[in-house]
């Protein structure tokens, strides 16, 4: 599944896991993307939307 929001364009954030011995390994934080059925220009369509866009009402379900 794509880790990008079709509404706001939010994508993954990158950083490091840091262990107790302070070794670093790269990792990524994916946004919480949900596949939502919404109406886009009069036709129902499925879009990938992050939960912050769904909560903010930017996606009409």
Swiss-Prot record:
<dbReference type="GO" id="GO:1990904">
    <property type="term" value="C:ribonucleoprotein complex"/>
</dbReference>
<dbReference type="InterPro" id="IPR034704">
    <property type="entry name" value="Ribosomal_bL28/bL31-like_sf"/>
</dbReference>
<dbReference type="InterPro" id="IPR037147">
    <property type="entry name" value="Ribosomal_bL28_sf"/>
</dbReference>
<dbReference type="InterPro" id="IPR026569">
    <property type="entry name" value="Ribosomal_bL28"/>
</dbReference>
<dbReference type="Pfam" id="PF00830">
    <property type="entry name" value="Ribosomal_L28"/>
</dbReference>
<keyword id="KW-0689">Ribosomal protein</keyword>
<dbReference type="GO" id="GO:0003735">
    <property type="term" value="F:structural constituent of ribosome"/>
</dbReference>
<keyword id="KW-0687">Ribonucleoprotein</keyword>
<dbReference type="GO" id="GO:0005840">
    <property type="term" value="C:ribosome"/>
</dbReference>
<comment type="similarity">
    <text>Belongs to the bacterial ribosomal protein bL28 family.</text>
</comment>
<dbReference type="GO" id="GO:0006412">
    <property type="term" value="P:translation"/>
</dbReference>
<dbReference type="InterPro" id="IPR050096">
    <property type="entry name" value="Bacterial_rp_bL28"/>
</dbReference>
<protein>
    <recommendedName>
        <fullName>Large ribosomal subunit protein bL28A</fullName>
    </recommendedName>
</protein>
<dbReference type="InterPro" id="IPR001383">
    <property type="entry name" value="Ribosomal_bL28_bact-type"/>
</dbReference>
